[in-house]
Amino acid sequence: MRFAALALSAVLLAACAPKSAAYISPTPTPIPTPAAQSQPSPSPQPSPTPDPTHVFVIVMENRSFAQVAGNSYIAHLATQYGVATNYHGVSHPSLPNYLALTSGSTWGIADDGFHALPAGGLGSELSAAGIDWRAYMEGMTRTCFNSPYPYALKHDPFAYYGASCPAQVVAFSRFASDMSGTVPRFVWITPDLCHDGHDCSNAVAESWLAQTVPLILATPAWQDNGLLLITWDEGEDSANSVLTLVIQPNPLLHQSSRPYNHYSLLATIEDELGVPRLGEAAQASPMSDLLATPPVPPLRHNQTG
């Protein structure tokens, strides 16, 4: 993984070169496949960071780490904020990964069909704790169960818990206006089947991110100790590697090679919002080394005599 991180650094340094206002695509550089998936080591659940505010999550589709790391806007974000270089999806196809991200379990599901699961999941947990949240589904023009393409029910995990459409799951058309008003403590964003990269190119998906992410970064909700997490549901390589960005106002570490997965991301969300961890997230390592928390002083070797 050290070689993979160094190779990524070469790509990201290219993105840091002086440029005009428009982003300039760096010269594509092959990036070695990240190491095969290893389970994150169990860790005690830490206390939430002081005064946690808002957490935003964007889930993109079907790209391995190397397929997106060199993209212009993504490389720009990775040079400015945190990037996990040893992060993996937990299953295939899409649905079990979305369920893992929102409940700490794949529920043994290995397809993208509809499954009526018990009520619960992250949304219910937040509601029970009195934390306001909203999930924005791009392309959802009717209810969560009967909206046509390019909306995809399999990318709306909140509809599976209790087989219902929570009131907090809304159309993405509300997103821009909501960001200029009162922003919920937790925000989930699912792009439509084109903008998430599922049916369209990297360039289209990256352009969507370049339009959407600045709307989040411009909010006081993010600027005041907020956290934006961008990940991909599953990779297309044998290791199921995906790139994950950890975007905070004052990051301390740009790259982490620690082994993380979707349970780690859920643990991070729950720790930041101060709620108990669900399912496998209870045993996962949160992405604490990429968060903007006070650094640990370096160890010093004091010689005497």
What residue ranges belong to the model's regions?
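C-terminal motif of bacterial Sec signal peptides marking the signal peptidase cleavage site
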Residues: L12-A15
